[in-house]
Amino acid sequence: MIASHLLAYFFTELNHDQVQKVDQYLYHMRLSDETLLEISKRFRKEMEKGLAATTHPTASVKMLPTFVRSTPDGTEHGEFLALDLGGTNFRVLRVRVTDNGLQKVEMENQIYAIPEDIMQGSGTQLFDHIAGCLANFMDKLQIKDKKLPLGFTFSFPCIQTKLDESFLVSWTKGFKSRGVEGRDVVTLIRKAIQRRGDFDIDIVAMVNDTVATMMTCGYDDQNCEIGLIVGMGSNACYMEEMRYIDTVEGDEGRMCINMEWGAFGDDGTLDDIRTEFDQEIDMGSLNPGQQLFEKMISGMYMGELVRLILVKMAKEELLFRGKLSPELLTTGRFETKDVSEIEGEKDGIQKAREVLVRLGMDPTQEDCVATHRICQIVSTRSASLCAATLAAVLQRIKENKGEERLRSTIGVDGSVYKKHPHFAKRLQKTVRRLVPNCDIRFLCSEDGSGKGAAMVTAVAYRLAYQHRARLKTLEPLKLSREQLLEVKRRMKVEMERGLSKETHASAPVKMLPTYVCATPDGTEKGDFLALDLGGTNFRVLLVRVRNGKRRGVEMHNKIYSIPQDIMHGTGDELFDHIVQCIADFLEYMGMKGVSLPLGFTFSFPCQQNRLDESILLKWTKGFKASGCEGEDVVTLLKEAIHRREEFDLDVVAVVNDTVGTMMTCGYEDPHCEVGLIVGTGSNACYMEEMRNVELVEGEEGRMCVNTEWGAFGDNGCLDDFCTEFDVAVDELSLNPGKQRFEKMMSGMYLGEIVRNILIDFTKRGLLFRGRISERLKTRGIFETKFLSQIESDCLALQQVRAILQHLGLESTCDDSIIVKEVCTVVAQRAAQLCGAGMAAVVDKIRENRGLDTLKVTVGVDGTLYKLHPHFAKVMRETVKDLAPKCDVSFLESEDGSGKGAALITAVACRIREAGQR
């Protein structure tokens, strides 16, 4: 008993000593985490070189665009063919993908041989043979009458220029078909099919096996965005942001990059990591100096590395008593499967003995222990190197997405990963150690090269179908120049109807006289109060206007809220509250009891009979104070002042915010004769000739007309421009059938139009994987500010996704592109419609004055104009295009509703004083 324990102890110690000896000898092959992180850092740099246009030509890691722009989302369906050519045999497959709530993939395939004479013959012979095999397969399945989409896995070095265009760089794997290198493989296969003439197919996609692996796994797990192969060769691909791929035009979305990482180190980057054994393998290979990383990690070289180490150690008399057999001295005799078997057996030492005996050796126990340990070190290094480069890829994706913690899946294929007993586990553990801030799942690919090609095709088909469907839906929102000219013409007609006494009553564009008959001339001076009431908050302002050398405007203001019970109470309560706030402001400014001229910006629909008389037609914006509609708001304000008996005010002018905007800008620019607001709502005003304002007596001079153009189209004159989405937004609004033009182009409604389009797309499976969230059903979630943010040029798609997530909408990268596209189309139409309306206004001014050309400035205010990244530019371009005889400048207003009311009051006081003199 004691003897057997002693013997076991002796062997354990012996083994331990031998392992230590090998570990010491192969010290440089055992890589610390510190070294692996350094390799990872170097690989990141190489990736960046491959992506950048300037360094791509000399980069060793080529980072080739694959033109695969999306991974599966699980809604793919249809029948597809796949060709898989990567060796002496090739396969034809029929892949049926169903999506009836249960994702299912059915495959039938047949393997065909490629005879040596065809591999070495002409390209025509090779592709005729492939087309013949394809015909045979389709015959058997009786599908020759169908024109099916086909994906082609072509595992040879290619330069891809489109998804369905791929130029062969050079043959490998024993192929030498003449006249193929440098040519597009897809064209060659198409021509071969045409020569036959007995069937037709639609070649949609050319992919390599790594991409196919990612796509296969992507169908089962939508987080899969990396493909990895570790077999006879090694490579990886991943989904990169388009904005970083300099070699392809476009910044939107993502594209799969075929890294060709086997060439990492070809420029000397890994020279300090490579050992003498790596150098020896390279020198004896078919392609010295190339694919150096692959030679350190892939199955083609793993067994050979072990053999070279054994030979060197034997020559140094560290193994086999210094003796070597001819078999062990023969390249390729120690295979990678031997490495797997030695490491896989419970008694790996015994397996090592069997392999060594097969190779004509007579090993001792120590030799077998050493061989087992060498296999472990070589395969562990392979897994570690693989993990280092994968860590770089994961870190890059994480940074691209701007996420604190990345959740991602890696689709993996290849004999080393699948068949080596410990490779997968070692790789996974090392990756998780190197990138602890990533949650990584490894998914084994089942038939990546066949099913994957079909999946790329299925995704391309889905994207193409969805793109066509979306284009068709968005088409009515894209207005041609002719359509915009027609909108301009109709606006002019409606303006004439609003000005005419005869048609005014039935005209939707009311063209209301404002009794503002002059713009500022710069001589205005004095202190004025201004009230600005247009929502749940209102402002009281003191505006000091100076002329002469100190010309300018100085403002002080205070904001007060209007509680809901007052908004919904009586008119007396509302105006008493307003007067209370004025009293508070005067006390705050140290002006208690002072009587000043007052301008009142009152942004509700009114009929104005004088500058200081304005009849409220109806409350909007949530106000419901009783006893106000049909009453003069100036009288209501004066009565409230008298009730308080604390101060008196001279109410000189009631104005709306559009006129205030024109006057504010008119103070800065004497050419300003038009006011425009494009914010939550939209309206315009302009200086009209008095002779055309039939509702007011007098022919001389000009008067500002408040167009109230938001109601353009309320008589049905825009029905042919209204889409189903405009109709839906109108029907669910607080005022159906009213303000139709405003509902097509103002900030309050653009988000709702977008939301309705997104719901339509989702219902039809074109967006959000066909899943409508409760959040998307919620009216009003798409505020104008989100549209502005989403369309911002400096915003990456990840940030668009973040905005959508904030709105409770889980989206993919593709979804983000679509949402951005919808926002762009809706906002562009809004800007163009606004431009068409403005073109009608400035052209009318020009024609009124009988001018060939008009120079005019438009004062503009409103969040949509000021904050949206493209609205202003598109609108200005539209005006320029539709009113070419007008030289129109746009001046942004600063506080039109407050400062503007004071300036109207100042102008009125100036004119009144001049009249008194």
UniProtKB/Swiss-Prot annotation:
Subcellular location: Mitochondrion outer membrane; Cytoplasm, Cytosol
Pathway annotation from the record: Carbohydrate metabolism; hexose metabolism; Carbohydrate degradation; glycolysis; D-glyceraldehyde 3-phosphate and glycerone phosphate from D-glucose: step 1/4
Positions contributing to D-glucose 6-phosphate 1 binding: D84, L85, G86, G87, T88, D209, D413, G414, S415, S449
Annotated region (Mitochondrial-binding peptide (MBP)), positions in chain: 1-16
UniProt GO MF annotations: ATP binding; D-glucose binding; fructokinase activity; glucokinase activity; hexokinase activity
Modification type N-acetylmethionine: residues: M1
Annotated control of activity: Hexokinase activity is specifically inhibited by 2,6-disubstituted glucosamines.
Keyword terms: Acetylation, Allosteric enzyme, ATP-binding, Cytoplasm, Glycolysis, Kinase, Membrane, Mitochondrion, Mitochondrion outer membrane, Nucleotide-binding, Repeat, Transferase
Cell division is among the record's keywords: no
Entry binding sites for D-glucose 1: S155, F156, T172, K173, N208, D209, N235, E260, Q291, L292, F293, E294
Residues the entry annotates as binding ATP 1: R30, D84, L85, G86, G87, T88, N89, K425, R426
Residue numbers spanned by region Hexokinase large subdomain 2: 656-895
Hexokinase large subdomain 1: region residues: 208-447
GO CC, one annotated term: mitochondrial outer membrane
CDD domains: ASKHA_NBD_HK2_meta_rpt2
Enzyme class at the top of the EC tree: transferase
Sequence segments annotated as region (Hexokinase small subdomain 1): 73-207
Membrane topology: Peripheral membrane protein
EC number of the protein: 2.7.1.1
Residues reported to bind ATP 2: 532-537, 680, 747-748, 784-788, 863-867
Catalytic activity: a D-hexose + ATP = a D-hexose 6-phosphate + ADP + H(+); D-fructose + ATP = D-fructose 6-phosphate + ADP + H(+); D-glucose + ATP = D-glucose 6-phosphate + ADP + H(+)
Family according to the record: Belongs to the hexokinase family.
Subunit organization: Monomer. Interacts with TIGAR; the interaction increases hexokinase activity in a hypoxia- and HIF1A-dependent manner.
Domain text: The N- and C-terminal halves of the protein contain a hexokinase domain. In contrast to hexokinase-1 and -3 (HK1 and HK3, respectively), both hexokinase domains display catalytic activity. The region connecting the two hexokinase domains is required for the catalytic activity of the N-terminal hexokinase domain. The N-terminal half regulates stability of the whole enzyme.
Entry protein name: Hexokinase-2
Organism: Equus caballus
Protein encoded by which gene: HK2
